[in-house]
From Swiss-Prot:
MF terms (GO), sorted A to Z: exo-alpha-sialidase activity
Compartments, as annotated in UniProt: Secreted
GO CC field: cytoplasm; extracellular region; intracellular membrane-bounded organelle; membrane
Keyword Chloroplast appears in the UniProt entry: no
Protein's name in the database: Sialidase
Active site annotation, chain numbering: D62 (proton acceptor), Y347 (nucleophile)
EC number assigned by the record: 3.2.1.18
Enzymatic reactions: Hydrolysis of alpha-(2->3)-, alpha-(2->6)-, alpha-(2->8)- glycosidic linkages of terminal sialic acid residues in oligosaccharides, glycoproteins, glycolipids, colominic acid and synthetic substrates
Domain of life where this protein originates: Bacteria
Positions with a binding annotation for substrate: R37, R245
Keyword vocabulary terms for this entry: Glycosidase, Hydrolase, Repeat, Secreted
């Protein structure tokens, strides 16, 4: 649904209104998991819908026993098959975890997934003053549209796997959501990093990129502002534009880089235009699509969080038209017009492929999917 005064809501044929589908159900699932978090979606060229979620076996806590599950549909969402895509390393039955997936589809069709891995209690960015000993970033890949997955590859044990990591790194992980392949074939994954600076830990948004189909990566530099973290990027005319969580600011920040993440500056058309309430910010999604008239648009999902703190209510989708910035940032719809669960909620992920638009989002311990293609059709009629 959308705000009743929203142009897109007024023009939507009620018979085409998207209906939510519970993909990962905390009350009915094959793992007896009590909670699901961190949704991720990729729409594939052959029509396959591939989604992911943290299996939070014992509840919403970040510092717990967690694996990453996949849900896969080859019949446009009518039926789904479930699997564990990445398992934690089973060192500690309370705290071993892989979590917060970030995915990308390369030009070869390979699907790459990276996730953070830990084995002890404590916040990934703030618990230690030196590089955390139980931390790693793990990568897996699939060459059969998500049917099977490779063994885990440790990107942090061998420094040659990810070049240009700062010496004052506490830890890093993916930006949570999806990456892109640039027009020249470079794979770009959003990332977030914790650094030790002036006797305190600060966290920032950045990217990693690969020019060899994910075999090795190079880390870009941090954005100008700390308290940024989970982000996604799109390519526009060879530049990277980032939309990112920005804690305690009350809005989503936006940056642009013309040198593959070496330097970043504020991207004014999007920076501060999407409000996210008081207190902690929240993850969001940011993808690019093209309309029928050839306009390049950005689609952003994020909670409005009108009640502040961790309620993260009203997960909404917004649009910016890069070829007509005079329109500003427009609200498209609110797929989840409810309060989030303050113990864990508000996250979402968008995907666009072959004129189809989909979203997955957190819904009080479940992960729901909606086909938002009817709204994309309305965008085309603007």
């Amino acid at each position: 649904m959308c705000n009743k005064n929203n142009t897109f809501e007024k023009n939507l044929d009620i018979s085409h209104k998207p209906e939510p589908l519970i993909l990962f159900n905390k009350d009915n699932n094959i793992w007896n998991s009590k909670y699901f978090r961190i949704p991720n979606i990729q729409l594939l060229n052959d029509g396959t819908i591939l989604t992911f979620s943290d299996i939070r076996y014992n509840g919403p806590d970040d510092h717990a026993y967690i694996d990453i599950a996949s849900a896969r549909s080859t019949d446009f969402g009518k039926t789904w098959s479930y699997n564990i895509a990445m398992k934690n390393n089973r060192i500690d039955s309370t705290y071993s975890r892989v979590m917060d997936s970030t995915t990308v589809i390369t030009n070869t069709g390979r699907i790459i997934l990276i996730a953070g891995s830990w084995n002890t209690n404590g916040n990934w960015a703030m618990t230690t003053s030196t590089r955390r000993s139980d931390w790693s970033v793990q990568m897996i890949y699939s060459d059969d549209n998500g049917l099977t997955w490779s063994n885990k590859i440790d990107l942090t044990k061998d420094s040659s796997k990810v070049k240009n990591q700062p010496s004052n790194t506490i830890g890093w992980l993916g930006g949570v959501g999806s990456g892109i392949v640039m027009d020249d074939g470079t794979i770009v994954m959003p990332a977030q990093i914790s650094l030790r600076e002036n006797n305190e830990n600060n966290y920032y948004s950045l990217i990693i990129y690969s020019k060899d189909n994910g075999e090795t990566w190079t880390m870009g530099n941090k954005v100008p502002n700390s308290n940024t973290s989970e982000n996604m990027v799109i390519e526009l005319d060879g530049a990277l534009i980032m939309s990112t969580r920005y804690d305690y600011s009350g809005y989503r920040a936006a940056y642009i880089s013309h040198d593959l993440g070496t330097t970043w500056e504020i991207y004014e058309p999007l920076n501060g235009k999407i409000l996210t309430g008081k207190g902690s910010g929240c993850q969001g999604s940011f993808i690019k699509a093209t309309t029928s008239n050839g306009h390049r648009i950005g689609l952003i999902s994020a909670p409005k969080n009108t009640k502040g703190e961790y309620i993260r209510d009203n997960i909404a989708v917004y649009m910016i038209d890069f070829d007509d910035l005079s329109k500003g940032v427009q609200e498209i719809c609110i797929p989840y017009p409810e309060d989030g669960n303050k113990l864990g909620g508000g996250y979402s992920c968008l995907s666009f492929k072959n004129n189809h638009l989909g979203i997955v989002y957190e819904a009080n311990g479940n992960i729901e999917y909606q086909d938002l293609t009817p709204y994309y059709s309305l965008i085309n009629k603007q």
